[in-house]
Amino acid sequence: MRSNGCGDLREQNIDQQVQLCGWVDRRRDHGGVIFIDLRDRSGTVQITVDPDLGADAFTVAEHLRSETVLQVEGKVRARPGESLNDKLATGAVEVLASGITVLNSVKGNLPFPVSVHDEENTREELRLRHRYLDLRRKRMNDNLRLRAQTIQAARRFLEDAGFIEVETPVLTRSTPEGARDYLLPSRVCGGEWFALPQSPQLFKQLLMVGGIERYYQMARCFRDEDLRADRQPEFTQLDIEMSFMDQEQILELNESLICAIWKTVKGIELPRPFPRITWHDAMEHYGTDRPDTRYGMELTNVSDIVKDMGFKVFSGAVKAGGAVKCIAVPGGNDAVSNVRIKPGGDVFSEAQKAGAGGLAFIRVRDGGEIDTIGAIKDNLSDEQRQELLSRTGAEPGTLLLFGAGDTATVNKALDRVRQYLAKELGMVKADRDNDQWNFLWVVDFPMFEFNGDENRYEALHHPFCAPNAEDLGGDASKWSETLPGARAQAYDLVLNGLELGGGSLRIHDSTLQRQVLQTVGLTLEEAQEQFGFLMDALDVGAPPHGGLAFGVDRMVMLLAGEESIRDTIAFPKTQQARCLMTSAPGGVADKQLEELHVASTWVEPDQED
């Protein structure tokens, strides 16, 4: 049906007879000669239709609409000098049509134009509703190809390294892993339920017990959680697990994997080794465990300097066990006005969204003089002022922004303000123009965090992470005391402020695993009920093992320079977890529910009393 791709034609094809198939991208009538931009997945080429050289083809071309599907026969020739188009890969040639066959026409009006010239002007809701049409756009086509290239590069590397791809079950049982499960009622086993996997975590550990040693999978995962631009209810993760490797070996192997992917997809040699930072230092200096290190403005703790100030906002926060931290914004005096920092201003609002009551500020002038509100200036001694300037490295023109309160809120607020100002002040490029790849390993996470509302410990990652042996100690009788304060042998890979993947060494001893499950609030009976199969497996000679999982959708989003993972998935859901194209989720017949032994209690909001 076709001999060449539209985007493959070059000067070496001149004088060749070709058959092309594709869609009409644009049609232009230049007074007697019609030009058609014909598009397929390989690109676009100009078709010239001259009535003197192809009367039948011209008759067809007169009535063509955008997105009509064509087969074109003709001869490749050089474009005249005045019509050369260096913006097109095929811009040096055109095809003189001798025949045009309409393979399918467009019925009715298109919901939106597909041409690259119009693709920025369509609402996302409309694009998702007609995704099959949206996929014809070059940008979407390129993203899906980049996704395939990324997955192929990962598979090639892992298989060369001795890993084998193993599929794990999609229908499994519900276990407490953090997010809500998607549940499926069993028709055969009435009253019992399957859950879709949030990850293959336990199955990949069981594969290690089974002697597989090196496993990977492009795993489909499902989480019923609140969505945002870089989350979907169903997603793909590159899941990796390996036996008889320590943390250092796992990190080195996965660095090599990432470098291989970036080399294949972007043609970039990434510098190695990737920097590392402990979780504690990340929280102290960036306010987050996902630091963006492309720019400065690190958080500086100044609690000891201001703890005795007469300015009660600062001293009161320290006395209450909180902290006072600040970020130094270079050039901030000119770039950030007082109006923006005060209530109602955009910078103030960013801090407020993170729970802060406000922001204090100091403007550094020539000679180390400062401008600020009177309550700070009147209560800041020369010694304190000098110490602040010295510790923050603030030069004239610098704006110091302060957060005061409980440490968690201060960290969260200043992290948000830091990221916001970096974009506002041009410290980072727009996603599509990004050429900085700042990878960072975050290590030494706490095993647990305390949930004050429920008065219990929760696993910071999951309850299968191995604790640091030094923190745990060798006396099993004291594990209940040492575990809550222990560090996990866990690690996250962060790229430009986004978590790209994470993993850990796993517990391979059933006694320790039971103790960890007890620490997060499970009784021994509950642990056996929910995880008895895992404990049984650990008791038959489980090897030391560990692994990591990368978010494929997020990785492709970063490689493609997109702002949302929805633009890297063929058929994504909205932030309300809906598919606008198929209208999923949807209702089902009562008979189907009866077969599943399920009854719906849902009441439409306008029908409630």
UniProtKB/Swiss-Prot annotation:
The keyword ATP-binding applies. Belongs to the class-II aminoacyl-tRNA synthetase family. Type 1 subfamily. Its EC number is 6.1.1.23. L-aspartate binds at E177, R223, H461, R506. Keywords: Aminoacyl-tRNA synthetase, ATP-binding, Cytoplasm, Ligase, Nucleotide-binding, Protein biosynthesis. GO terms for molecular function: aspartate-tRNA ligase activity; aspartate-tRNA(Asn) ligase activity; ATP binding; nucleic acid binding. This is Aspartate--tRNA(Asp/Asn) ligase. It catalyses: tRNA(Asx) + L-aspartate + ATP = L-aspartyl-tRNA(Asx) + AMP + diphosphate. GO terms for biological process: aspartyl-tRNA aminoacylation. It is found in: Cytoplasm. It is an enzyme of class 6 (ligase). PROSITE patterns: AA_TRNA_LIGASE_II. One of its GO terms (cellular component) is cytoplasm. Residues 201-204 are annotated as: Aspartate. Aspartyl-tRNA synthetase with relaxed tRNA specificity since it is able to aspartylate not only its cognate tRNA(Asp) but also tRNA(Asn). Reaction proceeds in two steps: L-aspartate is first activated by ATP to form Asp-AMP and then transferred to the acceptor end of tRNA(Asp/Asn). InterPro entries: Aa-tRNA-synt_II, aa-tRNA-synth_II, aa-tRNA-synth_II/BPL/LPL, Asp-tRNA-ligase_1, Asp-tRNA-ligase_1_N, Asp/Asn-tRNA-synth_IIb, AspRS_core, GAD-like_sf. ATP binds at R223, D224, E225, Q232, E499, G551, V552, D553, R554. The keyword Membrane does not apply. It comes from Synechococcus sp. (strain CC9605). Homodimer. The record marks H30 as: Important for tRNA non-discrimination.
